[in-house]
């Protein structure tokens, strides 16, 4: 197979995904197009050489519908020959977009492609796309569906992570994110977002709360307790996992990923097009893997996917110096570290989505750029 290189990564700062957030007035199309323009301008790209643009988006409806990737290439003034496609693999969408772009280059069907994602959670809220799990009781019943927040609480209950454990992890995420910004670790990848007048509206991650403490988090109420008790989701979880005595609802707004707006792009290509265009590779992609996990607990999947990818690449855990895992909920990362025996000092060293936020379709490409 052809070697594939990462030539550049860019992302927006993450804006609070609320009407008062700095990016609320910026449409998802503008977010995506601005990052495509940045990739082009930073690398002096002849965009006719880009074979495809693949974007993750978890709520591909409304302003994010109608194949936002293709339209964004046109809005970014890319050559009309550049194709575009939107994909949805939930929170892995941005990473899967990069994987798909990589696969096209690996197999020789493309020389250069862009993978990334976009999500304006303030303008197109979670759940806007509906779906059978949320609307068809027969589907939810057959698959033992529960919302992800309760899945995270199930993980905490099954493996004994206390409220103090998850809160302590969240505080460390905030500290690491703040330190990373202070040390300008993101300066090469974060591109400020501009309004239609060309004025920069945001140039830093808006969601961070570096002043948070264990004491301040202790005052937050669990986010999923009422839902679990009143809508039968706790009973569903316990039916599927009878070894768990009860669901301890330990997750709340302070130790879960933040709702934010943002976009990200990753430029990948083979060696020959990089040399022809004068590009310097930042990294080589050895391989990737996907896996489906049991859908009730679902959030244990990352460790299985990581192990599968290591096997495919002929590598061991000891070969990995730094790990990045989306901080959807604190217990997810705690379980990943325990399952793979990873030291906390080797994972999410720049902070993560608990501190900086999780723009659903874009985060996977964002954390790849961080790594």
Please place each PLM-identified region on the residue numbering:
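Glycine- and Gly-Pro-enriched alpha-helical subdomains that act as flexible
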Residues: 269-319, 337
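Conserved beta-strand-centric core segments of catalytic alpha/beta enzyme folds
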Residues: 1-34, 93, 97-129, 136-148, ...
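Conserved catalytic cysteine-centered active-site region
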Residues: 57-110, 143-150, 218-258, 339-371
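Active-site-proximal alpha-helical scaffold in enzymes
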Residues: 87-118, 156-186, 265-272, 338, ...
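Short, well-ordered amphipathic alpha-helical segments that serve as non-catalytic structural scaffolds
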Residues: 28-44, 68-72, 97, 149-155, ...
